């Protein structure tokens, strides 16, 4: 049994708290708001993000980071990617010295173009071999409902990856290990942008041929970027690559796909945000940082560039489609 701290009580953080508790660990969950922590402790549910889904009574929620982090063997960071650094700067003195730090945030930091593992290493002042990434086709609601799913735990220290794997192995949740942190992170961050494109296409009423084209060519550009940054190309054919991409691009539970769908129907960014409970999809933010990261790495990412144009440069979805279909002919 491990002591696990989950820092962030959103839908995915809460779901993973349940997973680790169901796997037999001692789990503490940090929530920003007192009323949410109280609901988790007394009613054993998260009414804001996972209403009516029962949580294990063993999960102890707190608004005090020190309480949540005390004696933790595994610390899971579940806050939005663009807030991770600011939170870590406050939490760093509280982190247990030998704990494995696990990122479940999927994005690229706008200010630095750093991956989340790099943000953790920098802001917390820890060595990279203590940092792991959990990524895969893991829609929070389905996992919380105990529908069978698998994921990848990536860490350069194989022993740490295996320790997290063992701790996360609930009856309905099967973790695999991997040492390719960069590949897992690039796959997780970029798939949100491709899911926006799939949502836009669905909003325009386009069919399966279009979706399959976006997913397949999206995977190609994700792989190009990942390999240029040092990732193993085989990672992108696995759970953290193709698996995560298919789930996020296909499911109506995907916030990024839903957001893109609203844009495809002619909605503005503001209207799409309102339709997703006031939350901007991660892919909207990531399209900017990933597009700039691709430019810096001199990697062509046409779908990402097209989504960036819609989200940040006022390009219409119709014009985006015309531009993508009119690109110079090339070999696959």
Curated annotation (Swiss-Prot):
Pathway: Membrane lipid metabolism; glycerophospholipid metabolism. Sn-glycerol 3-phosphate binds at residues 106, 136, 191, 244, 254-256. It catalyses: sn-glycerol 3-phosphate + NAD(+) = dihydroxyacetone phosphate + NADH + H(+); sn-glycerol 3-phosphate + NADP(+) = dihydroxyacetone phosphate + NADPH + H(+). NADPH binds at residues 11-12, 32-33, 106, 140, 255, 280, 282. One of its GO terms (molecular function) is NAD binding. It is found in: Cytoplasm. Disulfide bonds: none annotated. One of its GO terms (cellular component) is cytosol. GO terms for biological process: carbohydrate metabolic process; glycerol-3-phosphate biosynthetic process; glycerol-3-phosphate catabolic process; glycerophospholipid metabolic process; phospholipid biosynthetic process. It comes from the Bacteria. Its EC number is 1.1.1.94. Keywords: Cytoplasm, Lipid biosynthesis, Lipid metabolism, NAD, NADP, Nucleotide-binding, Oxidoreductase, Phospholipid biosynthesis, Phospholipid metabolism. InterPro entries: 6-PGluconate_DH-like_C_sf, 6PGD_dom2, G3P_DH_NAD-dep, G3P_DH_NAD-dep_C, G3P_DH_NAD-dep_N, NAD(P)-bd_dom_sf. SUPFAM superfamilies: 6-phosphogluconate dehydrogenase C-terminal domain-like, NAD(P)-binding Rossmann-fold domains. The active site is at 191 (proton acceptor). Its main location: cytoplasm. Belongs to the NAD-dependent glycerol-3-phosphate dehydrogenase family. HAMAP family: NAD_Glyc3P_dehydrog (MF_00394). Catalyzes the reduction of the glycolytic intermediate dihydroxyacetone phosphate (DHAP) to sn-glycerol 3-phosphate (G3P), the key precursor for phospholipid synthesis. This is Glycerol-3-phosphate dehydrogenase [NAD(P)+]. The gene is gpsA.
């Amino acid at each position: 049994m491990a002591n696990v701290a989950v820092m962030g009580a959103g839908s995915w953080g809460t779901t993973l708290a349940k997973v680790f508790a169901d796997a037999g660990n001692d789990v503490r969950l940090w929530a920003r708001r007192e009323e949410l922590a109280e609901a988790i402790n007394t009613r054993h549910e998260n009414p804001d993000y996972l209403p009516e889904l029962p949580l294990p009574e063993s999960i102890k929620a707190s608004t005090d980071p020190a309480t949540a982090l005390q004696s933790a063997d595994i610390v899971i960071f579940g806050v939005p990617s663009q807030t991770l650094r600011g939170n870590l700067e406050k939490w760093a003195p509280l982190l247990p010295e030998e704990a494995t730090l696990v990122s479940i945030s999927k994005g690229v930091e706008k200010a630095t173009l750093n991956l989340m593992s790099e943000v953790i290493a920098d802001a917390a002042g820890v060595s990279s071999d203590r940092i792991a990434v959990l990524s895969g086709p893991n829609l929070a609601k389905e996992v919380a409902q105990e529908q069978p799913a698998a994921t990848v735990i990536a860490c350069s220290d194989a022993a740490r990856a295996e320790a997290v794997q063992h701790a996360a192995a609930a009856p309905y949740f099967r973790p695999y290990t991997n040492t390719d942190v960069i590949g897992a992170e690039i796959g997780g961050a970029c798939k949100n942008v491709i899911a926006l494109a799939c949502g836009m296409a669905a909003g325009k009423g386009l069919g399966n041929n279009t979706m399959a084209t976006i997913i397949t060519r999206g995977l190609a550009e994700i792989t190009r970027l990942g390999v240029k940054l040092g990732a193993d190309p085989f990672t992108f054919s696995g759970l953290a690559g193709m698996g995560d991409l298919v789930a996020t691009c296909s499911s109506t539970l995907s916030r990024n796909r839903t957001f893109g769908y609203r844009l495809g129907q002619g909605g503005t960014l503001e209207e799409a945000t309102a339709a997703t409970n006031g939350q901007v999809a991660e892919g909207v933010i990531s399209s900017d940082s990933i597009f700039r990261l691709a430019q810096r790495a001199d990697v062509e990412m046409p779908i990402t560039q097209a989504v960036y144009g819609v989200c940040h440069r006022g390009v219409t979805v119709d014009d985006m489609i015309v531009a993508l279909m009119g690109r110079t002919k090339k070999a696959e």
